[in-house]
Curated annotation (Swiss-Prot):
Entry annotation: catalytic residues: 126
Protein name: UDP-N-acetylglucosamine 1-carboxyvinyltransferase
The EC number(s) this enzyme carries: 2.5.1.7
A biological-process GO annotation: UDP-N-acetylgalactosamine biosynthetic process
Length: 430
């Protein structure tokens, strides 16, 4: 099992190219099930989750072709991948594959819309809370589907003639459920109105792609999305938007380690709240032609309280990274997690590096320390794993992060991107 070794104490200086967003690429790939034509996606990151989803889609009949020549972006690679599903050959998504990645459960929407029936295993993925499927079931039921849970699977069936447009309001904001209901509604009869919809940029990106395929979607990016059903969708060519979570992660790494880094191929507008929070913590952030420049001013790291919220609030996927930054602040800060109920598993690992963090319910109190000291630590989930890397960049001595397969699910060539900016980071394969 691979480990990441970090020798702390080096500033970051240079250029880091930002990859395509994993959280956008996955639903876009799944949307290929909605058409018999070819969907071409550009700027697809090379990640474990992407590779796994390609296997899952292949089982359903999607032919996947990766361009032989990759678009070289310094130490990152933006791939162009063609997805063609002439015929859906299997409407069952097995436990063996779905249990490995929660997002693969989202095939339930396109399979139900195109074939009228499917059998999909209940999902797996990061162990950061229950993340129930109730919202998915209720939303699809509103479109006329019958849903039955049997032996760990959901058996879903559309009414004769296909799904029927309806008005449905989510009781709680859910990005995944918004993706699924929006995809399913594109082929439903009539008009669907989704209330309390997720407003994340990745939802907008999916809507833009679906519209390019012939869907009629309006309101994406607001809390009300309207979809006028069409009889079929065609192929399209679409570029995956930049990864705002990767962008924020590297910005926090610079704030933690110090230095001067330009983040290329990204957009400051994707994460206004997080960047404003970083500025309050002492980072100097300015927009460039195709990204941003991040520096840490001489005042050090200031304590800042945050509360995670759905977009446009502070992203839960940056919570662990920000907590790592606050361990070196000049005072006391608080991090409150409102999205997931079990997303503080990185706390005990940060404590191994010398962090002072106490928990009270869904709030963590962080007392900044003068220094962190390297130690062996263990990744518990995707975002927690990179928070340990960020802490290791500023820790004295050597930090080793084990179970980095979590890291490979969401960060493309992290060691290479940090190393080219002066960090001492290496992967140790065993």
């Amino acid at each position: 099992m691979d480990r990441i070794r970090i020798v702390g104490g080096n500033e970051l200086n240079g250029i880091i190219p930002i990859s395509g967003a994993k959280n956008a690429a996955l639903p876009l790939m799944i949307a290929s099930l909605l058409t018999s034509d070819t969907l071409t996606l550009e700027n697809v990151p090379h990640l474990a989750d992407v590779e796994l989803l390609m296997r899952i889609l292949g089982n359903h009949g999607v032919d996947v072709a990766v361009n032989g020549r990759r678009e070289r972006q310094e130490d990152s690679y933006a791939r162009t991948i063609h997805f063609t599903c002439r015929t859906i050959v299997d409407t069952t998504a097995s436990y063996e594959l779905v249990s490995k990645m929660r997002a693969s459960f989202w095939v339930i929407g396109p399979l139900l819309a195109r074939e009228g029936h499917c059998r999909v295993s209940l999902p797996g993925g990061c162990a950061i809370g229950t993340r129930p499927v109730d919202l998915f079931i209720e939303g699809l039921t509103a479109l006329g589907a019958t849903m039955e849970i049997d032996a760990g699977y959901i058996n879903a069936k559309a009414p004769d003639g296909g799904l029927i447009g309806a008005r449905y309001t989510f009781p709680k904001v859910s990005v995944g459920a918004t993706h699924v209901l929006m995809m399913a509604a594109t082929l439903a009869r009539g008009t669907t109105v989704i209330g309390n919809a997720a407003r994340e940029p990745e939802v907008v990106d999916l809507a833009n792609c679906l519209n390019a395929m012939g869907a009629k979607i309006s309101g994406a990016g607001t809390s009300t999305i309207t979809i006028e059903g069409v009889t079929s969708l065609s192929g399209a060519r679409h570029r995956v938007l930049p990864d705002r979570i990767e962008t924020g992660t590297y910005a926090m790494a610079v704030a933690m380690a110090g230095g001067d880094v330009v983040l290329e191929n990204t957009d400051v507008a994707l994460l206004d709240t997080a960047l404003e929070t970083l500025r309050r913590a002492g980072a100097d952030i300015s927009a460039t032609n195709n990204g941003m420049r991040v520096r840490r001013n001489g005042a050090g790291i200031k304590p800042v309280d945050i509360v995670t919220d759905p977009f446009p609030g502070f992203p839960t996927d940056l919570q662990a990274q920000f907590m790592a930054l606050m361990t070196r602040s000049s005072g006391i800060s608080h991090v409150t997690e409102t999205i997931f109920e079990n997303r503080f598993m990185h706390v005990q690992e940060l404590a191994r590096l010398g962090a002072r963090i106490s928990l009270s319910g869904q709030t963590a109190k962080i007392e900044g320390v003068e220094r962190l000291r390297g130690a062996p630590v263990m990744a518990t989930d995707l975002r927690a794993s990179v928070s340990l890397v960020i802490a290791g960049l500023a820790a004295e001595g050597e930090t080793t992060v084990s179970r980095v397969y979590h890291l490979d699910r969401g960060f493309e060539r992290l060691e290479a991107k940090l190393t080219r900016c002066g960090a001492v980071v290496e992967r140790i394969s065993e």
